[in-house]
Design a protein with these regions (language model features):
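An N-terminal assembly and electron-transfer interface module characteristic of large anaerobic redox
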Residues: 1-184
Length: 184
């Protein structure tokens, strides 16, 4: 996991519950005739990830462990490449707004806010005003911010990215911070 804080032991209950909501409201198996898998994994280490994925892929799809291992390595390489490209693009945006004496917005949220029906297309509204929007993952150094002295409990990766991007935005004159919140 990217967030190694001692308090990082849980996953957002809303995120965990989303598969149940989708299964009961949209019922993709009945409506579209496709299986709807929603396995729950607890990956405290790379070893846990490998073991749990091997077991799930073998049971659900009959995929041999060595094939699962190769797929996992390819997925990890692709994810690392994507993260590198995302941060490079974020760095480019921040350089551009600094040159133009403008600003970008770090739009922080939980995963379910990626749904346009939940976020009401706030990112599109902001970009329509000519203001670049960056997800916290695109902000250089977001995973390097020391959060140990935070008064906020950093209980999962979303909290770490939201708080890390807020700390960076607070010290960057060309980056504003907006956090989407659905409740309390």
């Amino acid at each position: 996991t990217e967030n190694r804080q001692d308090t990082s032991v849980s996953m957002c209950a809303v995120v965990k519950g989303y598969p149940l909501v989708i299964r009961n409201s949209d019922n993709p198996e009945r409506r579209f005739g496709i299986p709807f898998d929603s396995p729950l994994f607890h990956w405290y280490s790379t070893r846990d990830m490998r073991r749990q994925l091997r077991a799930y892929l073998k049971e659900a799809f009959g995929i041999a462990p060595d094939v699962a291992d190769r797929a996992l390595e390819q997925a990890r390489a692709a994810q690392a490449q994507f993260k590198g490209e995302l941060v490079a693009a974020g760095r480019d945006v921040l350089s551009r707004v600094e040159l133009e004496n403008g600003y970008a917005i770090a739009l922080a949220s939980r995963p379910y806010h990626n749904d346009p029906l939940v976020n009401h297309d706030i990112d599109t509204l902001i970009t329509s005003l000519g203001i670049p929007v960056l997800p916290p993952d695109a902000i250089p150094g977001v995973n390097d911010v020391d959060l140990r002295n935070s008064l906020i409990d950093v209980v999962n990766n979303f909290h770490a990215r939201m708080l890390g991007s807020a700390v960076i935005a607070a010290s960057c004159p060309h980056l504003e911070y907006v956090q989407l919140v659905s409740f309390g």
